[in-house]
Amino acid sequence: MASSLGKMTFPRAADKKLLTDLANRSFENLMKEFERKQRELQRASRTRKEMIVSSQAILGLKKPAIAELSSKAKARYESALAQRPKAGALRPIARASTYGAGGINYPPYSFPWNGGISCGGLSTCSQYGPNASSGQIGADLGGTGATSASSWDGIALWYYSQANAPMVISTQAAVYGQGYANADIYGYVYAYGDLELLVYDGSGNQVAGTVNVIYDQSGSFIYNNTYFNGNMYTANVSVQLAANQWYVVYVGSYDYVDLGAAAGAQVNLDTFVQQIAICDSCPG
C-alpha cells in the first residue's frame, strides 16, 4: 500500500521549506496512526472469522455447501449493485481558500494526501481522489468471497496561529454512493467507512483528532443496503494552540472491507469536503 503527499500550494510569503518539512513529519506520524488502526480492524475481523469457521465445523457444513452459499451471496451482491441509483453531480464551491487565515476555508485546499489503497481480491477497488482542487476524496471497494481491502486518502490545509488561544476546527462533507453488507449465517462481513479530522502541530505531532463514522456493518447472518445521495457529515475538534506556529489540518476518508465465505460488501463513498472552518479565540 503506497502512500504519498501531493502537490502543495503555499500561502503568500510563507517559508516553503518549513511547511514542506512539517507536511513530511506530520504525514509520517499520520501513517503510523493509520497502520495502528488497520491492525486493530484486522485483529477484530480475524477473531470473528475464526468463530464462524468453528461454527461451520460444529454444524458439519461441507465445502460444496459453502460454495453454493457463496454463489448466492455473489448473486445478491450483483443485484444490489444493479439497483443502485446513480450519484448526483456536485459542483465544487467556487471560492478561493484563505489558506489558514481563519474563518471558513473552501476548495482548493493546500494539498492532497494518499495513505494508499490495498485491493485484495475485490472485484471493485478504486479511489475517487484525492483532489485538493475540488475536495473530492473516498473510495469504491466491493466484491464477494474471502478477501479484504482498504483505502485512506484526503486533503489538508495549512493554518498559522498568531496567539495562544483555543481553536475550534470543523469540516463538512457531502457523501454520494452506497454501503452494502450481506452475509449468510455461515459467512462474515465487515464494511466500514468514515470521515476523519486530524490536527498536527509544527513539530509534526498530532494534537487533536476525531472520527465520524459514515457506514459500519459487521457480522454474519446480516443484510444492509444504504444509499447516499449528498448526505452531509461533519466532524469537529477543539485544541489549545500556540502563538506563532504553523499547523496542518488533515481531512480524510478511511474505507475498509473484510469478507469471509458466503458474503458480499460494498463501501462506495464518493466524498466531497465542502469546507474547513477554523475559529480561534472562541468563547466558551
Q: Which sequence ranges carry the predicted segments?
A:
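Mature extracytoplasmic or otherwise solvent-exposed domains
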Residues: 2-284
